[in-house]
């Protein structure tokens, strides 16, 4: 075997020194499988529930795990229904609804806006004339309909999406119909 082939074989057999910026080290694949990490759960709602006295419900204080609690490295993320707190077992139905409302900010949701029939009629009439109203029109509508301008903007976005979806569905139904050669005559 030539000296250059021997050097190549030796390089292949020897493992390179581990780098701190290698993919394996970044992903933690170079660590042992039985490693444990110290994790403290993130529970921001335990700090903000103290403001609930004005709502009449007692605040919910979830117990914190000690910081020494360790979890195995390969973390299996629980399904959403497992991850949700099981407070239904501890509170009445009205308290549960109130608690869900208090914690809903954590999920990034705001309460759904219920438009009255009159508001929908006015918005539909404006939509027929202009489906892309400017800020001045939206602010004027907000003042007249006693709504927030951003709710009106979202209503128009949703209405345009509904119109686009219905057009697509009607085009699909037209294309789905069997071709009739008698129509060409």
Swiss-Prot record:
Subcellular localization(s) per the UniProt record: Nucleus
Induction remark: Down-regulated during embryonic stem (ES) cell differentiation.
One MF term in the entry's GO annotations: chromatin binding
Sorted UniProt keywords: Developmental protein, DNA-binding, Homeobox, Nucleus, Transcription, Transcription regulation
UniProt-listed CDD domains: homeodomain (cd00086)
A Pfam family: Homeodomain
Region (Disordered): 32-69
SMART domains documented for this protein: HOX (SM00389)
Chief place where the protein resides: nucleus
InterPro entries assigned: HD, Hesx1, Homeobox_CS, Homeodomain-like_sf
Gene Ontology CC: nucleus
Tissue: High levels found in the embryonic liver, lower level expression seen in the viscera, amnion and yolk sac.
GO BP of this protein: brain development; camera-type eye development; canonical Wnt signaling pathway; cellular response to cadmium ion; ERK1 and ERK2 cascade; forebrain development; forebrain morphogenesis; gene expression
Quaternary structure note: Can form heterodimers with PROP1 in binding to DNA Interacts with TLE1.
Similarity comment: family membership: Belongs to the ANF homeobox family.
Protein name according to UniProt: Homeobox expressed in ES cells 1
Organism: Mus musculus
The organism's taxonomic lineage, starting at the top: Eukaryota, Metazoa, Chordata, Craniata, Vertebrata
Gene: Hesx1
